[in-house]
Amino acid sequence: EDTYRGEVNDPDTLHLYAYCKNNPINYVDSSGYKYSPQKAANYAYKWGVHPNPKYHEYSKDCTNFVSQCVHAGGKKMNVPREPLTPKTDELNMFWYAKRTKDNVWHITRPWRSVKIFYYYWKVHGAKTIVKSKFSEIEKQFKIGDIVQLHRNKDGWYHSVIISCKINGKFRYAGHTNNHSKNPVKKLKNKNNKWRIIRIK
């Protein structure tokens, strides 16, 4: 059973109840474990250049990759009860990347789409920050932040993750053009808006 504040149905889950009770509920999932932006960033740094073979890789892989990072940070996949089908993959209420026993991948739009990833996590409690000056968004960066880029001809078109600091300067990781520690100044190039998705 799920663990909720004020209710302990199973003595074996008492430690999870105590964890939930002493931490803000909007920062803790029902399993009693906290999301870790650092773990998400560590995954990004590790798999930024060479993709994790456990996952499907797209030719335009940016949001698929940041979803992997978020999952590594502690967010569980949101999977329907019914069997996975191409129809469930297109539903915006779910977030998963699963391979079936017959080796078919099922990956939802919120997992792989720049725009729908944003809307999914905004609904699920992420803090969002949007700026039209790079100097202003850069001041807001934290390790593990998802950053999305906008340009006039494409709209919101790319997702990356702040992966580390080197000599006091933030670096980011991303896929499509694979990298694990690019200087964040490169995010300024040819873009006119930036938004942070800070998952809790």
Each predicted region: which residue ranges?
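N-terminal capping segments
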Residues: 35-111
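Extracytoplasmic/periplasmic, Sec-exported soluble proteins
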Residues: 11, 36, 54-62, 130-141
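Active-site signature of cysteine proteases
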Residues: 152-200
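Short, solvent-exposed loop/turn and secondary-structure capping segments
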Residues: 1, 12, 29-31, 78-82, ...
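Short turn/helix-capping motifs enriched in Asx and small/polar residues
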Residues: 1-34
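Active-site scaffold segments
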Residues: 17-20, 63-71, 159-163, 172-174
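...with weaker cross-activation on analogous glycine-rich loops/strands in unrelated enzymes
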Residues: 91-172
